[in-house]
UniProtKB/Swiss-Prot annotation:
HAMAP family: Dephospho_CoA_kinase (MF_00376). It catalyses: 3'-dephospho-CoA + ATP = ADP + CoA + H(+). GO terms for biological process: coenzyme A biosynthetic process. Its EC number is 2.7.1.24. This is Dephospho-CoA kinase. Gene3D superfamilies: P-loop containing nucleotide triphosphate hydrolases. The gene is coaE. It comes from Helicobacter pylori (strain ATCC 700392 / 26695) (Campylobacter pylori). The keyword Repressor does not apply. InterPro entries: Depp_CoAkinase, P-loop_NTPase. Residues 6-196 form the DPCK domain. Pathway: Cofactor biosynthesis; coenzyme A biosynthesis; CoA from (R)-pantothenate: step 5/5. Keywords: ATP-binding, Coenzyme A biosynthesis, Cytoplasm, Kinase, Nucleotide-binding, Transferase.
Amino acid sequence: MVLKNAIALTGGIGTGKSTTIKILESQGYKILDADKIAHQLLQEHRFKIAQHFGSDILEKDILNRKKLGAIVFQDAHELKWLEDFLHPLIREHMLKKAYELEKNHQAYFLDIPLFFEVGGKKCYPVSKVVLVYASRALQIERLLERDKLKEAEILQRLACQMDIEQKRAMSDYIIDNSSSLKDLNKQVERFLKTLL
């Protein structure tokens, strides 16, 4: 079943996707957040995940995402294992909620950072794909400031995602977040007018 009212929102780390989501929410749009679902699933399945990665990733029976991240962002094989485990579960949850929202006959957004990496429209049959874009150099600059990560760590994480320019070429609409918050608001408004 095609999700006629669903719009996938994607981007890379540091492109401003979270800020864009806040703008959309302030306009009254419903958002299904793949990352929030992933965090819930990590906790629900923490013991199975710990069986694979070792009990060091648990603290008082709670999964420590930083410790898990330190493992998976340094080892492509381990990242693949985690993604192969989580992505089908995330997809199941997202689609179940999306089918419910379809009944409202109003546009809503699926916030999926790894939209293209997990199969794009084959996995999530949305009407449009919107990319929140910022150049790789700007992503790195923002992540250095925001997350206080070392540049090597940032480059490792970026390497785990499809290149932002590839995503740009595959998207139906681009929200360019290379400037100010005021400009981002204008870009979002411009996009929302295309939905009318």
